């Protein structure tokens, strides 16, 4: 989303509404129940190769018979618990390192490893997949599954394909269980993820592409990662997600020839295909997002920071906490809460200009 033409406002006008929603905000309008309000969604499609990865595909990413078992901490156990384990009980997870050469295309090897681990990964024994430090190409969509921990510290993954496609999603099909039951217990830790809009052949044609698109899920963590060079859309987009944490991440860079729409780095959304709002996950049951912690991130030289510019009549986004983040040189707005309930934005620092200014201030 974020592709609907709108009147460009001055930075001074936008800064006055940072972190708040005006009743007369031109991005929104009231709609009947079960309808949505949204800027037109970018036309985003999974590449066929990413959506149809099969079990038998050849790859260098192999699961060893002697995959290392590790004990995870009580904190990690809580993150992976489905609530059925006795309190304080620790579990184990298998750690598997992706076999890949520096400079290789990571798409097929990692997707095949995800599929190999899909049935094996459980609430009791989740799987940790390590991407070795190095530089890798990405030419399609990565499809991750429940009970997986993707560790990418020291790895740089750069999109090199000329088409517009998701960088990462849960599952390799749009169909899943509804509400928050589709996927669970997913952690993405580290890595530099370069969306590299420069490589896209038709940047100025309608639509951009979302980076990580997460829907119908519970217990999702994205931490310590760097996201670069967004094209007319979102680095991270969530729809119908409960219990999510985005911490310690950096977001930088966008296509500056395009200055319309939302383009939030972190978009909090609802599951509906009305106006192409969030079409990547079925069913379109109107599930919103609840219990988010967005803390300690840096947003630098981006179009918009965090928030929501679509909603379903009669439904709210609940318990969204945006704290201790730094926003520097944001074109449109840092934070937008739309139809939020029991939510907080505090102790965020907004540096409104590239050089020190009396207008630089903290938002509490």
Map each language-model feature to its residues:
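N-terminal extracellular ligand-recognition/capping segment immediately after the signal peptide
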Residues: 101-111, 125-165, 171-173, 193, ...
């Amino acid at each position: 989303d974020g592709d609907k033409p709108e009147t460009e406002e001055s930075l001074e006008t936008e800064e006055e509404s940072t972190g708040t929603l005006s009743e007369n905000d031109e991005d929104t309008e009231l709609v009947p129940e079960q309808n949505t309000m949204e800027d037109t969604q970018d036309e985003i499609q999974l590449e066929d190769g990413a959506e149809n990865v099969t079990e038998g595909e050849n790859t260098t990413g192999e699961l060893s018979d002697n995959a290392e078992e590790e004990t995870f901490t009580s904190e990690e156990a809580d993150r992976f618990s489905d609530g059925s384990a006795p309190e304080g009980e620790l579990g184990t997870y298998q750690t598997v390192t992706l076999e890949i050469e520096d400079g290789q295309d990571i798409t097929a090897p990692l997707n095949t490893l995800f599929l190999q681990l899909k049935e094996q990964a459980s609430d009791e024994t989740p799987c940790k997949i390590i991407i070795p430090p190095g530089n890798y190409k990405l030419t399609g969509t990565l499809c991750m599954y429940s009970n997986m921990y993707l560790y990418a510290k020291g790895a740089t993954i750069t999109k090199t394909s000329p088409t517009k496609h998701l960088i990462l999603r849960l599952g390799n099909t749009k169909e899943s269980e509804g509400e928050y039951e589709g996927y669970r217990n997913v952690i993405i830790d580290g890595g530099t993820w370069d969306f590299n809009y420069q490589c896209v052949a038709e940047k100025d044609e309608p639509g951009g592409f979302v980076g990580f698109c997460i829907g119908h899920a519970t217990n999702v963590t994205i931490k310590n990662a760097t996201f670069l060079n967004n094209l007319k859309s979102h680095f991270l987009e969530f729809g119908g997600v409960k219990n999510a944490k985005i911490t310690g991440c950096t977001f930088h860079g966008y296509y500056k020839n395009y200055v319309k729409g939302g383009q939030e780095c972190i978009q909090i959304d609802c599951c509906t295909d009305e106006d192409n709002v969030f079409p990547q996950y079925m069913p379109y049951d109107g599930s919103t997002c609840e219990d988010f912690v967005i803390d300690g991130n840096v947003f630098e030289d981006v179009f918009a920071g965090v928030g929501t510019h679509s909603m379903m009549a009669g439904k709210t986004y609940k318990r969204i906490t945006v704290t201790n983040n730094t926003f520097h040189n944001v074109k449109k707005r840092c934070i937008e809460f739309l139809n939020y309930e029991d939510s907080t934005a505090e102790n965020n620092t907004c540096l409104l200009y590239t050089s020190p200014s009396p207008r630089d201030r903290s938002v509490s």
